[in-house]
Amino acid sequence: MAKFQAPVINDNPLGWGPCAVPDQFKDMPYQPFSKGDRLGKVADWTGATYQDKRYTNKYSSQFGGGSQYAYFHDEDETSFQLVDTTKMQKTAYQRNRLRFAQRNLRRDKDRRNMLQFNMQTLPKSAKQKERDRLRLQKKFQKQFGVRQKWDQKSQAQLKPRDSSVEVRSDWEVKEEMDFPRLMKMRYMEVSDPLDIECCGALEFYDKAFDRITTRNERPLKSIKRIFHTVTTTDDPVIRKLAKTQGNVFATDAILATLMCCTRSVNSWDIVVQRVGSKIFFDKRDNSDFDLLTVSETANEPPQDDVNSLNSPRNLAMEATYINHNFSQQCLRMGKEKHTFPNPNPFIEDDVDKNEVASVAYRYRRWKLGDDIDLVVRCEHDGFMTGANGEVSFVNIKTLNEWDSRYCNGVDWRQKLDSQRGAVIATELKNNSYKLARWTCCALLAGSEYLKLGYVSRCHVKDSTRHVVLGTQQFKPNEFANQINLSMENAWGILRCVVDICMKLDEGKYLILKDPNKQVIRIYSLPDGTFSSDEEDDDDDEEEEEEVEEEES
């Protein structure tokens, strides 16, 4: 009968596991292993049987392999060392080596592609298409100034512009208005203009200038006539009107500067005088306010040195000189005139009337709401007659070409007759602020037409001799739409400035356009600022006393 035999149990009273190693397991070699090891070998007792070092540790167990590097705490700290793990600073050559290598590879690849393209045989039609493509590409690069470089180092860096007047430490900022906020303003409660007085005499526009082309250009003459650029408070007519009507007074040039200020780039300033409840907008004596800027709004405006022929100030003086001469040369000088009821208020008794420029002054009045009564002195430069004999007033201005190689310009002698739209588009881009001011002045004066003359240098390096290449005529309302000039926004800007000035105390203030930011600021000026001598101060005090007496 089978019986159960209990196995021999080795009891270890002092711990776990067997008391002794069985005889069959004595002297048996053993290597620590892990269950996650790959099973790709039978045995490897030495670890040095592989010739290729890449496979040394591929199939060997890593169990316990790092025990020799284990740290055991001991009283002796001499074996402990700190290792510097900071990265080595690369030299400029090492940093740019990869980028230069990639650029060289691209350049070599482009050369190989170009060589391969030149060696292949193309049919005549394909060759013609490729020549046309290259020609158009060069044309666009020249016209729009395309840069093929990855950086912009080749472009001229814009210099910081100077302020039109130095801001002193004792001037206090009363208000600051940024252009994005002004561009959103609208004002539509503007009454129709009312003519108060008309002064001066106008000469007839010579229509022969409308037939001038680049093939029969006409030299620009130097005409010695007197142009009066009188500020608001020095105008005797405005002084007389201020006693009976109006509470805001200005000239059309000053108002156009404010109404179109969001297009301006250069710095300008306007003096504001608060006398009682009346406001006078003036310009400073001996300032550059009446100079015409050139390429002010271009992407790369002229930035030559002061002594250079094409410095901003020299170009502005040249443009003003051209504008004065052309506005008189295109008239029938010394012949029939259109005379207004009142004479020119700025002609002195000892001055010959024929030496005074053809200009008429129209004093007009607008109502801006119930509290603003605006009186403005506007100007006309000439007049024309229609088929039925009706009289049309004209404002005459001039665009001048100084060097077509700059400011992405086009050659007028090649494009003016065939592509006049491209010429006016380029001028609108480079002289947006100047064209907007001229259009605004024509709208304020009520002129039926705006005449633009195209005048160029005889040679790009000679700023003393010029030729007339053509003329162009616009209606101010239509031209305002073409140049995207919104009169609602212009009136809104003016109303905003007037409201701010109405809240100021009596005194003298300055509206200054920041030379390098799209911001205009209003500063309060101490007494006596911008006063040339004591006589000017006495005249201002007498004027203030007269206005206060009328108000009382």
From Swiss-Prot:
<feature type="region of interest" description="RNA gate">
    <location>
        <begin position="288"/>
        <end position="302"/>
    </location>
</feature>
<protein>
    <recommendedName>
        <fullName>Eukaryotic translation initiation factor 3 subunit D</fullName>
    </recommendedName>
</protein>
<keyword id="KW-0396">Initiation factor</keyword>
<comment type="similarity">
    <text>Belongs to the eIF-3 subunit D family.</text>
</comment>
<keyword id="KW-0648">Protein biosynthesis</keyword>
<dbReference type="Pfam" id="PF05091">
    <property type="entry name" value="eIF-3_zeta"/>
</dbReference>
<dbReference type="GO" id="GO:0005852">
    <property type="term" value="C:eukaryotic translation initiation factor 3 complex"/>
</dbReference>
<dbReference type="GO" id="GO:0003723">
    <property type="term" value="F:RNA binding"/>
</dbReference>
<dbReference type="GO" id="GO:0098808">
    <property type="term" value="F:mRNA cap binding"/>
</dbReference>
<feature type="region of interest" description="Disordered">
    <location>
        <begin position="526"/>
        <end position="552"/>
    </location>
</feature>
<feature type="compositionally biased region" description="Acidic residues">
    <location>
        <begin position="532"/>
        <end position="552"/>
    </location>
</feature>
<comment type="subunit">
    <text>Component of the eukaryotic translation initiation factor 3 (eIF-3) complex, which is composed of 13 subunits: eif3a, eif3b, eif3c, eif3d, eif3e, eif3f, eif3g, eif3h, eif3i, eif3j, eif3k, eif3l and eif3m.</text>
</comment>
<dbReference type="GO" id="GO:0003743">
    <property type="term" value="F:translation initiation factor activity"/>
</dbReference>
<dbReference type="GO" id="GO:0033290">
    <property type="term" value="C:eukaryotic 48S preinitiation complex"/>
</dbReference>
<keyword id="KW-0694">RNA-binding</keyword>
<comment type="function">
    <text>mRNA cap-binding component of the eukaryotic translation initiation factor 3 (eIF-3) complex, which is involved in protein synthesis of a specialized repertoire of mRNAs and, together with other initiation factors, stimulates binding of mRNA and methionyl-tRNAi to the 40S ribosome. The eIF-3 complex specifically targets and initiates translation of a subset of mRNAs involved in cell proliferation. In the eIF-3 complex, eif3d specifically recognizes and binds the 7-methylguanosine cap of a subset of mRNAs.</text>
</comment>
<dbReference type="GO" id="GO:0016282">
    <property type="term" value="C:eukaryotic 43S preinitiation complex"/>
</dbReference>
<dbReference type="GO" id="GO:0002191">
    <property type="term" value="P:cap-dependent translational initiation"/>
</dbReference>
<dbReference type="InterPro" id="IPR007783">
    <property type="entry name" value="eIF3d"/>
</dbReference>
<dbReference type="GO" id="GO:0006413">
    <property type="term" value="P:translational initiation"/>
</dbReference>
<dbReference type="GO" id="GO:0001732">
    <property type="term" value="P:formation of cytoplasmic translation initiation complex"/>
</dbReference>
<keyword id="KW-0963">Cytoplasm</keyword>
